[in-house]
Amino acid sequence: MLVLEINKELRRSYALVERNFNLIKRYLGWEVVFMVYTVVNTLTIAFIGLSPDGSGQDKVLYLVVGALLWGFLSVLFHEVAESVQWERWEGTIEYSFMAPMRRLTYLGGVCLFAAAYGAIRTVIVMFAVVSIFDLDLGSANLFAGLFVLLLSSLSFIGVGLMAATLPLMSAEKGSQAAHILEAAILLVSGVYYDVSVLPAWMQKLSLISPATYTLRAAREALLNGASLREIGSELLILLATGVILIPLGLFVFNRAELYAMRTGKLKRSG
């Protein structure tokens, strides 16, 4: 009986993933625009590391790793955090919340789609960058880098769930507030520079950002070929952060949903 119930919930989550990919097909033109922008933006960042004589491959790789990782994590954050805003705009949020499914199933489907969508975009951008730059990944531990990416997804899903409550609390400004949170994480996490260059008080803030440990571990794995054991401390921090943030995100989301229902804030806006 339990197996059947789990299978039913998984199928419902998959239905949400399928629905979101169908929405991408519906707005395919915009997806192409966003993808071109992402590729050009990543290439622009990578060219910063090059010297006029063509040297600086290490700097380019450092920047590319940061750009690719941040691209994946930001997509993960965006898709989870803006799922409520998107459904409100589509006029389907009340139907989704009234559907006979557990809230965990609904949010699980959103998170699965975000992870799959983010991975696809990251792979496309990576191939575009590799086709332009002659990057040497011979010493990279790709398995460890992928493991870091998967583990860090847990933390960002938790943060995204909490950020998804902002559009519930404020239909007009909630989405913009989520962008402010994303910008703060970008600033203190050392995406394009080492956190040691930050002012002392910002370095303290970087310690509470899961992206800091993601970038540190991934760069060690991809630039220096570090093994899972060598980046074990960062992996443990990411695991602990994910274990804490996902239940916390679910709790905060449920509380915000009850508030939105009580105050009538689930109606379409825009």
Model features per residue range: what roles?
Residues 1-270:
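Hydrophobic transmembrane alpha-helices and immediately adjacent juxtamembrane helices
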